[in-house]
Amino acid sequence: IHYVEGYSLNLFTSAQVMLKPVRQQKVGLLIDAGLEPDLKKRHLQVADGCNASLGLDIGPCITTERALQINLNRGLTGSSWGNIEEPDILLRSAEKLKQSGATAIAVITRFPDDGESLETQLYRQGKGVDAIAGAEAVISHFLVKNLLIPCAHAPALSALPLNFDLDPRTSGEEIGYTFLQSVLVGLSRAPDLVRKVNLDLKDNSFTQRANLLSIDDVGAAVVPQGALGGESVLSCIERDIPLVIVNNPGILNVTSKKMRLDERTSEKGLKVLYAKNYLEASGLVMALREGISIKSLRRPINSVSELN
């Protein structure tokens, strides 16, 4: 399993970068000056705890010159979005971390508290949109685009009041002041991003690429029905990589029907498989990997037919 940020995934699926697995990354901490002193200390304690208990290589650490000021918005589709008031300050701090030896960066920014909003309440019950996810994506995409090293974001928020009606999928976000620990664990083993244009063409290509993963190594893409318009999915379709489409409806509505994937299946040979849930999807992926005919797994099984 490789921890790959969304923009990095876009670069990977479009064949612009390859992934180089590593044993350990040196994770720099980038802290928004907008954090209150107590909240900042909580996050530093999390970093110390991950260092002591998990053996992660964390540091150096830098605090931005002034607050980054994150704004949360909603897009026309209803999905969450956001923007950074001080992107230049964010980038300067990240560049200092990279120059100081960090090979991956965990960003901690102060997000607006909206624990009482209807959107947040619905999300906690497993029925709504994650109001902060879009802004988080903007931050990590921005840094990866400029630095080309693994980056991920952990929002800093005030602790939410106890809720007895939580959806299990959100429970992990309720146990403390921070999401940082999961980010640090993921980044600690995140693969390096290697641009194809930087590979030495004069060198033996097999030697260079023996430990690199490319889009050519991908055997299938598992995607929720309705979320087929993303850049990575489109890149997979362009390369005729088999799609396993899972019935997991959300707010987006870019479906296989709207994408006319069934037409492409008959015309171009793209393999599109449908699954009712992720358990079924995992079985389809296993069958593809082992070269098992999907038809042999469905009932009834048709008899072999002779050509006229």
Per-segment meaning from a language model:
Residues 48-62, 100, 141-152, 238-245:
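Structural alpha-beta junctions
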Residues 59-76, 154-166, 253-255, 260:
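Short connector loops at secondary-structure junctions
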Residues 76-84, 93-94, 98-101, 105-108, ...:
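Generic multipass alpha-helical transmembrane bundles of integral membrane proteins
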Residues 30-34, 62-64, 108-111, 146-147, ...:
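Fold-independent oxyanion-binding glycine-rich loops
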Residues 42-50, 143, 235-236, 256-258:
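Short, aromatic/basic amphipathic alpha-helical patches
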